[in-house]
Design a protein with these regions (language model features):
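Amphipathic alpha-helical and helix-coil boundary elements used as assembly
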Residues: 1-389
Length: 389
């Protein structure tokens, strides 16, 4: 830990006046996930109206001015009520978390993946000023059908993003947070201050520093279960055409994307895109590199430059995929001035695109269900249903 008197932690609640002061917080901020921050505060009012706090926007400030996490308060509780001071617990989440509370059965027709994502967001009041797509370079054809069966809107949104290789992150300021989608590494912002590796001093003030960074190796890490995706015509798009049982090698010849033997039509270009993104996702899952820092400004989805690490290959740019924040300020209780902050990091090489891991699968429909269409319904007859529905 480092004592940093320049990073006080504050919580500003929209349209609400209180004497609540933050004594500690912890929170996990990860790429392609919904963040959650647990905040402990003290106040002199033992009868604080907790219902009045729910659904209010709030900004948890830590680090430099205007740096922090914005969200909405989804939980509020009184942990201890004393004669002179009371302890409260608040939970801060993004507006996107609302999608986790609606589970339904529905069929979406003739929508691209970005169109489906926008429709899900707007159904929960997340309008265009609170979400955007940037640096979108891929092909996203319309899906004839996309089935939502007993899964939440959030699960469906994350599943579609995982299937298409679209990542999302959050941008924060004191007034709001914005949900940002992209499929290109160019969309990741670069952290302005590089992280210099330095061993922790036993005492005294310490500037923003990378305290630890190392790779975790495992015998079982990266072992994957083979999955064969069947295309609409019943053929596996990545299977060698001329492969024979018992042949010494069944690899297709490699052709650069820009060569004459490259994609000749839309379907072939789409297959190459899916294959490339699957390979990128596998590469992202192969290595497990973690670190620790007292740098309060680190957020998931940022590119961080590492300097002065004793292992030279770590001195490079890294994509932060997960940041586990923890902080406390004991001077609120004791009249002292220690500010302990810690961020546990998980990173990828800058060249990786941060493709989301395929951790969410569509629900299995095991019974016949009736449905009604409010408008014109176009039925699709084919021998195989697309596995990405």
């Amino acid at each position: 830990m480092c004592e940093d008197q320049q990073t006080p932690v504050t919580l500003t609640i929209a349209d609400y006046q209180s004497d609540l002061r933050v004594i500690s917080f912890s929170g996990l901020d990860a790429l392609n996930e919904v963040y959650r921050f647990d905040i402990h505060l003290i106040g002199i009012d033992p009868d604080l109206d907790l219902h009045n706090l729910l659904e209010r926007g709030a900004f948890l400030g830590f680090g430099q001015v205007d740096q922090g996490i914005h969200g909405r308060i989804c939980q509020a509780s009184r942990v201890y009520a004393g004669q002179h001071v009371s302890l409260y617990h608040l939970v801060l989440v993004p507006t996107l978390e609302k999608l986790a509370h609606r589970q339904q059965r529905r069929v979406y027709q003739d929508l691209t993946a970005p169109q489906l994502v926008v429709q899900l967001l707007e159904a929960h009041g997340i309008e265009a000023d609170a979400q955007r797509f940037e640096h979108m370079t891929g092909l996203y054809p319309r899906r004839a059908l996309c089935i939502q069966h007993d899964e939440s809107d959030l699960h469906l949104l994350q599943r579609v993003c995982e299937e298409e290789g679209i990542h999302f992150r959050f941008e924060h300021d004191a007034e709001r947070h914005v949900l940002v989608f992209s499929d290109d590494a160019v969309g990741f912002p670069v952290q302005a201050v590089p992280a210099r590796f330095k061993h922790l001093k036993p005492a005294g003030p310490c500037p923003p520093t990378l305290l630890h960074m190392a790779e975790t190796l495992s015998m079982h890490h990266g072992r994957r279960r083979a999955v064969e995706r069947v295309d609409e015509d019943g053929a596996c798009p990545f299977a060698p055409i001329d492969a024979q049982p018992g042949s010494p090698a069944a690899n297709q010849p490699f052709q650069p994307l820009g060569s004459a033997a490259g994609p000749r039509d839309h379907q072939q270009a789409l297959r190459l895109q899916r294959g490339a993104r699957t390979l990128q996702r596998i590469r992202c899952e192969r290595r497990d590199i973690r670190g620790r820092s007292n740098h309060a400004a680190l957020r998931s989805g940022q590119i961080l430059q590492v300097l002065d690490h004793p292992e030279r290959w770590f001195n490079d740019q890294w994509l932060l995929t997960e940041v586990d924040h923890w902080a406390r300020q004991l001077q609120v209780l004791r009249g002292l001035n220690p500010h302990d902050t810690l961020a546990i990091l998980r990173v990828l090489a800058d060249q990786q695109c941060g493709r989301p891991r395929r951790s969410r699968c569509p629900a299995m429909v095991i019974a016949i269900a009736s449905a009604s269409s409010p408008g014109r319904c176009r039925f699709v007859r084919r021998s195989n249903v697309d596995a990405r529905q």
